[in-house]
Amino acid sequence: MGRKVHPIGFRLGIIKDWSAKWHASDKGFAECLTEDLKLRKAIAKKYVDAAISQVDIERQSNKVTVSVRTARPGIVIGRGGQRVDEMRHFLEELIGKKVQLNIVEISQAELDAFLVARSVAEQIERRVAYRRAMKQAIFRSMQAGAKGIKVCASGRLGGVEIARREVMHEGRVPLHTLRADIDYGCTRAHTALGDIGIKVWVYRGDILPEAKEQSEPEVTEMAAVMADAPAAAVAEAKVADTVAKPKRVTKKAEAEASAEEKPKRAAKKAENITKEEE
């Protein structure tokens, strides 16, 4: 049975970047990974209603830079940046290191796969029909400029006893095209009858490599002179070039020339003999 590859992991290093940028030794790797999990869980728990899509972590010696991508930066920042300072102090106490907190705003939440999945999950938790929630999410994403979207819901849909899976899609979602900018997000909707899993793929267009600047061909000194010189000067240069380089005489040409000279020599010799007899 085939397995689907994670769309973001499949494109890492090509058009996608890592969410954690740091290097650690074999002994310190587990510690850094545990700190990353603590940071992400603490931020997600503290800002449930902030529409946080992704948390990027970068480490430099004893300093940790945390970038939070959110569609509602006002909730995270607070009045006069008060909540940012509180969150930074909380994270520093959590891991025992200096933390720099950056807030990155998401301009279009309808093109972010995780935020689309969260909106569908929240509607299902409020007892909205799952088909209606999925159709609304697809419509809003396509209106926002998405080239294609696919939404998958799995679980006890509609309260039935047997779990099933339902998929809705619109437009193109080329999963095997590496240059295709496909965002992927998944989450859960917690209901009284159990959890319902939501997966979303959003195709936002192709990311083409930057065109390399073509270097101009090297112009030699002779070519520059020929380009600047008038037609008469060019003709003189060609004549001088032919004069300076004499034609090479082949053996065949020499034989033909000697054959032509033989009759002339015989006629001249006969003429000399006639003059002597007279």
From Swiss-Prot:
Residues 244-278 are annotated as: Disordered. Residues 251-278 have a biased composition (Basic and acidic residues). CDD domains: KH-II_30S_S3. The keyword Ribosomal protein applies. GO terms for cellular component: cytosolic small ribosomal subunit. The keyword Lipid metabolism does not apply. It holds the Pfam family KH_2. Residues 39-107 form the KH type-2 domain. Coiled coil: none annotated. GO terms for biological process: translation. Keywords: Ribonucleoprotein, Ribosomal protein, RNA-binding, rRNA-binding. SMART domains: KH. Gene3D superfamilies: 3.30.300.20, Ribosomal protein S3, C-terminal domain. GO terms for molecular function: mRNA binding; rRNA binding; structural constituent of ribosome. PROSITE patterns: KH_TYPE_2, RIBOSOMAL_S3. Part of the 30S ribosomal subunit. Forms a tight complex with proteins S10 and S14. HAMAP family: Ribosomal_uS3_B. Belongs to the universal ribosomal protein uS3 family. Binds the lower part of the 30S subunit head. Binds mRNA in the 70S ribosome, positioning it for translation. This is Small ribosomal subunit protein uS3. It comes from Dehalococcoides mccartyi (strain ATCC BAA-2266 / KCTC 15142 / 195). The lineage of its organism: Bacteria, Bacillati, Chloroflexota, Dehalococcoidia, Dehalococcoidales.
